[in-house]
Amino acid sequence: MNQDDKKKAVAQAAVRYVEQDSIIGVGTGSTVNYFIEALAPIKNDIVGAVSSSEASTERLTALGIEVFDLNSVDQLSVYVDGADEITEHRHMIKGGGAALTREKIVAAVAQKFVCIIDDTKNVGVLGAFPLPVEVIPMARSYVAREIVKLGGDPVYRQGVVTDNGNVILDVHNLKILNPVELERQLNNIVGVVTNGLFAARGADVVLTGSESGVQVNE
């Protein structure tokens, strides 16, 4: 299987975690796009979805799946999303698509977080993939200086504005040995909205697409 085949396989496998008559959380990214397509045959079995990005909202709406504002929903049965990197402890780096803040919010409301990935995303230690940090625009330079103090090399993601109207700093050269602590430290910097470490609340289920099929880690 090539990488796209692996993504399609895990996206299809994630459908079994979707409960009938429920509202589900839907993430953002190339693997999630396949999951949205996989929802088409069962779209009449669910009430609708809460989306983590404008891009996913457009795809869901195009399929005729109702998209709800999170403020009108008490809880979500499941949240399905991908990852840029993930460890055996189910800690992740997310946010390559700049949707990290809404992803983290929707994940917090969900009873179960199902992470769908291909096997290239598995790592021993997080940090080879640059860690995205969403920042209030006026605080960009200050936050960058504070990140340098933590040992990172922040790079401004030129030309990108998040759905929330903010900017992204991608932090390079981090070897993240304690992701829970670094997530907290970064979020404590004034001007940071959130960062792409999903460690304090990691994945509950990981579906990995590989040459041998879909591996399930629950």
Swiss-Prot record:
Designated gene of the protein: rpiA
Q: Which InterPro entries match?
A: NagB/RpiA_transferase-like, Ribose5P_isomerase_typA_subgr, Ribose5P_isomerase_type_A
Organism in which the protein naturally occurs: Pseudoalteromonas atlantica (strain T6c / ATCC BAA-1087)
Q: Which family does it belong to?
A: Belongs to the ribose 5-phosphate isomerase family.
Query: Which residues are catalytic?
Result: 103 (proton acceptor)
User: Which GO molecular function terms does the record list?
Assistant: ribose-5-phosphate isomerase activity
Task: Relate the protein's function as given in its record.
Answer: Catalyzes the reversible conversion of ribose-5-phosphate to ribulose 5-phosphate.
Q: Which Gene3D superfamilies match?
A: 3.30.70.260, 3.40.50.1360
Which keywords does this chain's UniProt record carry? Isomerase
Residues the entry annotates as binding substrate: 28-31, 81-84, 94-97, 121
This protein is called: Ribose-5-phosphate isomerase A
* Ribosomal protein keyword on record: no
The kind of enzyme this is, by top-level EC class, is: isomerase
Cellular component annotations (GO), alphabetically ordered: cytosol
Zinc-finger recorded as keyword: no
Q: Among the record's GO biological process terms, what is one?
A: pentose-phosphate shunt, non-oxidative branch
Pathway, per Swiss-Prot/TrEMBL?
Carbohydrate degradation; pentose phosphate pathway; D-ribose 5-phosphate from D-ribulose 5-phosphate (non-oxidative stage): step 1/1
Q: How does it assemble?
A: Homodimer.
Q: Which reaction does it catalyse?
A: aldehydo-D-ribose 5-phosphate = D-ribulose 5-phosphate
Q: What is its EC number?
A: 5.3.1.6
